[in-house]
Each structure stands twice: as structure tokens, then as C-alpha cells.
Amino acid sequence: MATNHIVPFVKASVSIFRDMLDLEVRSGETEEEGDAFVSRGFTVIIGFTGGWKGRFFLDMGGETALHIASSLTGESYSTFAEEEVLLSGAELGNIISGNAITDINNNNPGLNLRLTPPSVFTGEGLTMFNVRLSSCSVLLQTDAGPVKINVAVEEGNK
């Protein structure tokens, strides 16, 4: 996978964390992940299709998910299994991926990427495999805790 595919997702994540959640963000380096990804405990997955196929992971630990959900809703939560925490994570993933895909489509006329609905998985150490697809990650350090952005893309015909 070309490492430049992750850039719009990182830019969108940094912007949303700063503007919407009022969190300071420091971005790490892009790293090749290969075909396996291990969850920190709370993972939002959003696929995309069109001229390219792929998926976006927004991954964080449970405490980070609780902090972010509280920032979004103004409520406090005791477990990341609460429905509002799951919905907040899904919505945050939707906003970030929507901004990233809009940026990609605007810079690649005719690509016409579209998003799938988000899914949220919980459980520390879950390993997810990309069949015949490698991915790249960037670790963001936020005031709420570390958040990993992971993107896998297979380019097709425009």
C-alpha cells in the first residue's frame, strides 16, 4: 500500500480532534502494518468502495474511548460497552472518514469513493487480518490518550 493513502485520514483526524473535541494532537510517523492489526481495545471500522477498495480503523484503548465519548456528549461513562460510548465512537469514525474521503474524491475526480456504515469492536488484543491487503498506521498522541489510525487500500480503475 502506498503510504500517502493514509495522509487524508490523519489530516481529518487531527482536525476533528482539535476542532471538535478540543484535544491537542501530536502525530507520529507512518508505519507499514502488513496484513495483521492488533486492537488496543476499542476499534471503529469503516469500509470504502468505488475506484478504490479499502477500510479505515480508528483504534484506541477503553479509557481513551470513554474520554472521547464524554467530550462528544458532555456525559460521563463507566464502561466503553455503554451504548452511547459505542455510538460516539461510530460517529467520530464517520466524521473523520467522511472528511478524508471527501478530500480524496475532490483531489481524484471520477474516483467516487463511498463509505460503508461503521462497525465498532471491543476487546483488547483482538487481531484482525487483511486478506491480500497490507495497511499503514499512524499513532496519534492526544490529551485523551493514544489513538491509532490504520488504513488499507487497494487501488482499482478510476
What are these model-derived regions, one by one?
Residues 1-158:
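N-terminal auxiliary interaction/assembly segments of multi-subunit proteins
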